[in-house]
Each structure stands twice: as structure tokens, then as C-alpha cells.
Amino acid sequence: MKRLWSLLCLLLLLLGCGGQAADGTITYVPSETAGRPGQVTAAATAAPLFTAAPTFTPTPEPTATPEPTPTPEPTPVPMEVRLRDYVAGMTDREKIGQLVMFGFSGTKSVSSEFGKIMADYAVGNVILYGQNISRDDRDGGFDRCAQLTQDIRAHSATNIPLLVSIDVEGGTVTRFRWRNKIVGADALGQSDDAEAARLQFQRIATALYDVGINTDLAPVLDVAKDPSKTFLGKRIISRDAETAARIGCAAVAGLQEGGCLSVVKHFPGHGATAADSHNVTPVVKKGLAELRAYELVPFERAVAAGADGVMVAHILYPEVDPDNIASLSEIFLTDILRGEMGFEGLILADDFRMNGLRSQASLEQAAVRFILAGGDLVLCGANHDYQRAILKGLTEAVENGTISEERLNESVVRVLTAKMKVSDWTP
């Protein structure tokens, strides 16, 4: 009994009993209600039997850092679009300057008069003739020509590279004195060796490019049944149109491989007349069907082979265009050369100093008519009065709208496209 009482007291102590009911039962007073502020009870001091399990708060997963969105590469602007945009930003003066190829006298430096024309009108292209080459120098004129072309470029009024041209055909038209002889067109035609023609013109182009010349006005693609009865003579490759085409295309390839533009001439053909367009306006009474069957064959093949330029002759073909010499004829330049043959390169007129042109129109009118017919580059040698007249005519025609901005830009784009082939310049 005594043991039972001891157990009961121990139980009361453990349970933190707060009192006893009248009927002798033990009453449990919860700890949160057993005491009052300031009153210490057994419930307040006794350790609880059970401790509530701690609430488990899961550690949040680290938020992944998103990969940065890569900046998309800008879409490259096609060169054709860049070129058109560049031309649209040029001044009229700069554009007109790209449409002329002028010459001057002198072998050492640009004359002061021509230097002023280059500066005033932003002349974009230059032609050299025999009078510019010191062929009697020990090296045949090459070193002095390199110095001359450097001076020419120093006078350029824009950062657009110049086309610097010359005509080296071989035979009687060589300009320099060549250490290793370059044979004439007739000899190439007689051998009918296209590979020999390609190698010769590749060598010519390499030598020209090394002295600062990037355009060769060659080869001659005129054909004639009897070349001796024409003023071109041995400059003609062959009386056979197929042979002339084959050798001519090889020459074009060689020039391009050597770093030069190739300008074939004299479209649509100078071989059916004995008259010299330097002195008079030749008249050739042949219809278009005859021309297509013979005279036009070498030109069509050269265009297909990728010739860079075509020079047009000052000859009247009344059965094709009774009102205009070929160089001023929309029929020849736009309908036939560009339309039928698909030519997209440069169209140059033969030298504007020639009587074959000047007997047909004033220089101002001729320059405008040439551009309107579809031409791109007006060529004029060392006559600075003529050059100013040409520039005056073109400037007035652009200002009064005779030559539209669209037509002007079209030719400038062609000229700049050609320049990119022989330089590292880009718009």
C-alpha cells in the first residue's frame, strides 16, 4: 500500500497535476491555461513528455540561369544593293566623272591643265596613248609609266579607284618596247593557236598591271574578207569569223587572268569598209542579217565568254539605223548588244576626237546621245577643250533631266562594278 501511494505521488509529479477534483480524480490542466501571468505552476516548469516534430521546409531547388539569347548575325547585304545605295549617295559631279575616260600629253606627270580638269570634274578614268609612253627608255618605258600612273592616281578627286587604260594589241600597236616580242593579231590568226594567244595576252596584262594599268582596249574582233583593203590591216585576226572568235576569246581570257579588263573592239565591225573613221564617217550598206552571219559573230562569242567591255565604232549602217552612227544608236547598243547578246558590261565609244563622230553631232550632243543610247564611257584623248565640252553637255543633260537619275545611276553602277574586278575597292 505504501508502495502504491509512492507510485501515485510520482505520477502526479510527472504529469504536473494542477489539482484534485471533489470526487478524488486527478484533473489535467493544460500548460497554456494552467497559470496566469506572473504565476509559476508545475505545468510551467515541468518538461513536456512529447516535443512536436519540427516542421520540414524543403530546400528550394536553385533556379537555373537561362542561357543568354544569342544576337542574330546581321543578314549580309548583297553587293548589288550596296552598290546601288552607294551610287545613290554620290553627287551628280561624281557620277558624271565616272562616265568619262580622258587622256593628256606627257610621260612624267599629269599636266597642270588636265590635273585641274580631274579635280574640277572628278574625272574617274584615264586613257594612255603612245605619247604617254617613253618607249625609247632602256626598259622600254615601263618604269616611267609606273611613275606616271602613280601621279595620275594622286590627282584623283575621290576614293574610287581609276580605270587606267591603254591599247596593246600586239604587232603594230604595242605602245611599249617589249623585251620579248608580242606578235600581231594576224599572226595569231594564222597560227590558229588559242593557247598561244591566251598566254601572250596574259603576259601583256601582267606587265600592264605591274605599272598601274588595269584595262587593255583589246583584242580587235573586226573581220574582213580582205583585211588589206581596210585601214585596220594586220590588226585583224582573221578573215574567218570563227577563227577570229576563237583567238579573240582566248585573248580575253588571258587579259583577265593577268589582272586587266578586256575591251573588245570595234563593234559592230569595221572590216567592211576601206574608210577610216578617224578621218570620215564610214558607211556600210549591210543589213542586220548579214551582220549577224559574219561581223557580229566574234563579238557575240566574246560577250558569251565574259568580255568586260565593248568599244563601239563611229560607222553608219543605214540599213540598220539610218539616223545614227553605231556609237549613238540605241538599236546597236541597247537592242542588239544588250538585248540580243545579253551584254551587261561596259560599253565604250571610240575616241570622241575622231571625225567619224564629230561630223555627225556636236561633242555636247554626241556625249548625251551616246549615254541615252545605252553607252557608259565617253572616251576622249588629249584635247582638253573637247573634254570640257563633253562634260558640259553631260552636266546640263543631267541637270535638266534629259539624262534621268535612273539612267545615270545605271551606267555608274556598271563602271564601279568593273572597277571592283581589278581592285580591292568595295562600296
What are these regions (language model features)?
Residues 2-10:
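Sec-dependent signal peptide recognition
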Residues 18-56, 61, 66-177:
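N-terminal hydrophobic targeting/anchoring segments and the immediately downstream early-domain regions
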Residues 117-244, 266, 271-287, 313-327, ...:
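Enzymes and membrane/adaptor proteins characterized by extended Gly/Ser/Thr/Asp/Glu-rich
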Residues 98, 122-124, 158-162, 213-214, ...:
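Short, well-ordered coil/turn segments that N-cap beta-strands
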Residues 402-427:
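Mid-to-C-terminal alpha-helical segments outside catalytic/metal-binding sites
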Residues 13-16:
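C-terminal motif of bacterial Sec signal peptides marking the signal peptidase cleavage site
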Residues 114-115, 205, 248, 252, ...:
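Generic hydrophobic/aromatic pocket-lining and core-packing "Φ" positions
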Residues 247-264, 290-307:
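Phosphate/pyrophosphate-binding betaalpha-module
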